[in-house]
Amino acid sequence: MSTGLTANNGIEEFGTIAVAMVTPFDANGALDIKAGQKLAAHLVSNGIDSLVLAGTTGESPTTSLEEKIDLLKAVKAEVGDSAKLIAGAGTNNTAASVEMARASAEAGADALLVVTPYYSKPSQEGIYQHFRTVSEATDLPICAYDIPPRSVVPIAPDTLCRLAALPMIKAVKDAKGDITAATTLIAETGLAWYSGDDPLNLPWLSVGATGFISVIGHLAPQLLREMYTNFNQGNLEKAREINAQLAPLVAAQARLGGVSLAKAGLRLQGIEVGDPRLPIVAPSESEIEDLRRDMNKTGVL
């Protein structure tokens, strides 16, 4: 638990450092339950206190509800109460999101991550009604995922304030990156705030975020924990040093995308989770060599 400089709200529901975990597949492209359990145990034993399953990095668009729930149950059996399990329950279909939320709750999820409906481009009232409907489907706390590059439509500040009044909306995963606007919203809404973009993890802590939901955490879980701990304890110079150390991984993620980065990087570390499903593709040999270089620079290979 945070006791220093970082914000405390949301820790009991969502933890501090989460990894948006990949969904492992075997050589035939089928769900690999054992690999998922192994990866979850590895991340938790290296400082991660929360796992997001069936999110964007978990290839939610190309996995079935049955696969999502099977992985959630298996990871729950593996890690127990040693980490919070946040289940992705966001689609651009409100009824489908409700179904996913209820199934995840029954399977043992601790919380839900619900993204702004993508592709449909709903109005702000539509966004509010979507989140309200999903939030009333279970008694699990919800982290609202604001990511305009994927959803096109952002969650407007007024809408966030309305969402904050709903009993089960407890947090925001911010991949919008407008720290200036969010600084006011953090204070006004009382919601727990989580960085949803690895380049901004440290800056977000400085304005009141509780933690971050990371992709590069697959490859550098201990470094992320060390950066968080040093910031929390007031060792800002060390926190900045670690943040700079992570920069090559951030650059690699920008080049490859989160799924391809995480799966290829884990393979280089000896943790096999298979290749992505189409339309995501694995990196080329030259891209893997560039990734190897970046991982060596970061000290995680």
Swiss-Prot record:
The keyword DNA-binding does not apply. GO terms for molecular function: 4-hydroxy-tetrahydrodipicolinate synthase activity. One of its GO terms (cellular component) is cytosol. Its EC number is 4.3.3.7. Pyruvate binds at residues 57, 213. Gene3D superfamilies: Aldolase class I. Keywords: Amino-acid biosynthesis, Cytoplasm, Diaminopimelate biosynthesis, Lyase, Lysine biosynthesis, Schiff base. Belongs to the DapA family. This is 4-hydroxy-tetrahydrodipicolinate synthase.
